[in-house]
Design a protein with these regions (language model features):
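Extreme N-terminal, non-catalytic leader segments
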Residues: 1-6, 73
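Walker A/P-loop NTP-binding active-site region of P-loop NTPases
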Residues: 4-62
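Short acidic, S/G/P-rich loop/turn micro-motifs used as interaction or catalytic elements
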Residues: 14, 89-94, 120-124, 148-150
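Conserved beta-strand segments of the P-loop GTPase G domain that flank and frequently precede/overlap
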Residues: 38, 84-87, 113-119, 141-146
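Switch II (G3) loop of P-loop NTPases
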Residues: 81-98
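Inter-motif core of Ras-like GTPase G domains
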Residues: 97-121
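Conserved C-terminal guanine-recognition region of P-loop GTPase G domains, centered on the G4
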Residues: 102-106, 122-142
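Beta-strand-loop-alpha "switch" segments that mediate conformational coupling across diverse proteins
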Residues: 146-213
Length: 224
């Protein structure tokens, strides 16, 4: 059965593209999985621009019902083991049109889970709650992006009723590692994939290798 991982967060500025890129790297390299990337952030397609030469990538705008129908066709046709969707900031469209896609997952021979990339603000939880309430059968993994502070500082999440509900529904939580700003800046400017970090200065290289190894340990079990 195909695995769909929808990298979401409901808003901009939580690090969705960074998490999606790390997940794509683990899926295509250490996990060795046949992967399809859906770039739904069509206004700022950084992930597609970085990875389209290394992995099959399709740009689909999910602002309309037609976009979700196109997504369904792409998933139905693909022979990929895993489909990774990089959602835009405006991904509340899942609440409006996502049912036509999610209700037909069995016919696509696919199962879906959501990786909800969050900062420490309350609206990250509120947006996640809206998705969980709309689609209770879709497991959600709450991804604490430690760029915004270590996991202990995600107190709103830790003390929330939503956390208990997510775990009861078969979801989970992950702590995504932070990487030095200078490394991320260099990689973004040069559009480097994680398997191309050898071109970085030595100090940046060893930091990128640390980050990549931590993401491997984090995401390999998640992809199983």
């Amino acid at each position: 059965m195909k695995k769909i991982i929808s990298v979401d967060g409901g808003k901009g500025g939580t690090g969705k593209s960074t998490v999606a890129a790390a997940l794509i790297d683990v899926a295509t390299t250490s996990a060795g999985m046949n992967t399809l990337v859906i770039e739904a952030d069509t206004s700022n397609p950084d992930v597609a621009k970085t990875y389209n030469s290394a992995v099959e990538t399709i740009a689909i705008c999910l602002d309309t019902r037609e976009g979700f129908l196109e997504l369904a066709s792409a998933v139905h046709k693909t022979t990929a083991e895993v489909i990774i969707i990089n959602n835009p900031a405006r991904s509340e469209k899942w609440l409006s049109y996502g049912d036509v896609f999610i209700d037909n997952l069995p016919r696509m021979d696919a199962q879906m889970r959501v990786l909800w990339v969050a900062n420490r603000q309350k609206d990250s939880l509120e947006l996640c709650k809206s998705f969980v309430e709309k689609f209770p059968a879709v497991p959600v993994t709450f991804c604490m992006n430690t760029y915004f502070g270590d996991a202990k500082k995600f107190e709103i999440w830790a003390q929330s009723k939503l956390r208990a509900r997510v775990l009861e529904n078969g979801g989970g939580e992950l702590v995504f590692p932070d990487c030095a700003d200078r490394v991320m800046h260099s990689m973004r400017n040069a559009r480097l994939r994680w398997n191309q970090v050898e071109s970085l200065d030595f100090g940046d290289l060893i930091e990128a290798e640390r980050m990549r190894n931590e993401c491997k340990a984090l995401f390999e079990p998640f992809l199983q």
